[in-house]
Amino acid sequence: MNSMLLIIAPAVCAFILTVIFVPMFISYFRKRKEGQMIREEGPKWHQKKSGTPTMGGFVFNLAILAVVLVFGLLTKNLHAKLLIITFILVLYGFLGFWDDSIKLWKKQNEGLKAWQKFLGQVVGALLFVFVFVHEKLPLSLALFGHELHLGLVLYTLFAIFWLVGFSNAVNLTDGIDGLVSGQAIIAFATYGIIAYYQGQFDVLLFCATVIGALLGFIIFNHKPAKIFMGDMGSLALGGALAAVSLMTHHELALLVIGFVFVMETASVILQVASFKLTGKRIFKMSPIHHHFEMCGWSEWRIDITFWCIGIICSAIALAFIL
């Protein structure tokens, strides 16, 4: 299949499926009068979002899964690499589904315990490494033009840290309408370009499909959001993004490409550390997007600013990689 068609066709199909089924999902939640419970310690004006349909990740994850499998078969790109990335999306999405379901059933903002999420994420990372070894892919990191060979044990620990860390980083970023959807589109587009230049058309197929699904989802997720992606969406996207970075062998570039996710996570770590050590907070609220909200920024202003940061950082990364 022509490389451009490989990008456009799955993206369009994922977009159409998402646009068709998200409104049905929204209608289902509204009829049942179920929706997201908003945490009380967040910005007070977020309380008006309480009851907004959630678990939108269920729709776009299914769209991604269906399109990847169909086009993987049609284009003969259904290789182990594509399957393991898709598996990470599904497994981490399932953890998010479980988490979101508990919140809905118990009508609270707390779902799975931290250790339960962590255990599931670690299992996914171990299976990812197993496929890596089976496919005889390099157990090393690309570092300033050099290969840093880690070996099986260190690479396994790194993969666990990377997959767990970025799935949670994306989850932390999902605090205002549309932010993660837009940022994930930018990140997957960047890695799609990298995969294209590497000739990894299976990874390119996955990235294109995710972009199409998220373009369909953001129509309903931008401010004011008609639906949230929930943990099912954010954990899945974060895990899949980390997996793609490992498969393209440009893992550390994700620190730049996904700088917004790193910044959000760092703001939480700094806030907690500062409060425990000094009793004072660095930010008005964390993650940092809430700090800007407390400073009077609108959600749209935060979205556009953070997306621009993401685009600039991705352009810098591509300039060094390509």
Curated annotation (Swiss-Prot):
Where does it localize?
A: Cell membrane
Q: Which UniProt keywords apply?
A: Cell cycle, Cell division, Cell membrane, Cell shape, Cell wall biogenesis/degradation, Magnesium, Membrane, Metal-binding, Peptidoglycan synthesis, Transferase, Transmembrane, Transmembrane helix
* Transmembrane feature ranges: 6-26, 54-74, 78-98, 124-144, 150-170, 175-195, 201-221, 227-247, 252-272, 302-322
Q: In which pathway does it act?
A: Cell wall biogenesis; peptidoglycan biosynthesis
The UniProt catalytic activity note for this protein reads: UDP-N-acetyl-alpha-D-muramoyl-L-alanyl-gamma-D-glutamyl-L-lysyl-D-alanyl-D-alanine + di-trans,octa-cis-undecaprenyl phosphate = Mur2Ac(oyl-L-Ala-gamma-D-Glu-L-Lys-D-Ala-D-Ala)-di-trans,octa-cis-undecaprenyl diphosphate + UMP
Which Pfam families does the UniProt entry name for this protein? Glycos_transf_4
Spell out the InterPro entries in the cross-references: Glycosyl_transferase_4, PNAcMuramoyl-5peptid_Trfase, PNAcMuramoyl-5peptid_Trfase_CS
| A GO CC term assigned to this protein in UniProt | plasma membrane
What EC number is given for this enzyme?
2.7.8.13
Q: What does the record give under GO molecular function?
A: metal ion binding; phospho-N-acetylmuramoyl-pentapeptide-transferase activity
Q: What class of enzyme is it?
A: transferase
User: What cofactor does this one take?
Assistant: Mg(2+)
Membrane topology value: Multi-pass membrane protein
> What family, per the record?
Belongs to the glycosyltransferase 4 family. MraY subfamily.
**Entries under NCBIfam families matching the protein:** mraY
Q: What does this protein do?
A: Catalyzes the initial step of the lipid cycle reactions in the biosynthesis of the cell wall peptidoglycan: transfers peptidoglycan precursor phospho-MurNAc-pentapeptide from UDP-MurNAc-pentapeptide onto the lipid carrier undecaprenyl phosphate, yielding undecaprenyl-pyrophosphoryl-MurNAc-pentapeptide, known as lipid I.
PANTHER family under this entry? PHOSPHO-N-ACETYLMURAMOYL-PENTAPEPTIDE-TRANSFERASE, PHOSPHO-N-ACETYLMURAMOYL-PENTAPEPTIDE-TRANSFERASE HOMOLOG
Protein name, please? Phospho-N-acetylmuramoyl-pentapeptide-transferase
Identify the species of origin. Answer: Ligilactobacillus salivarius (strain UCC118)
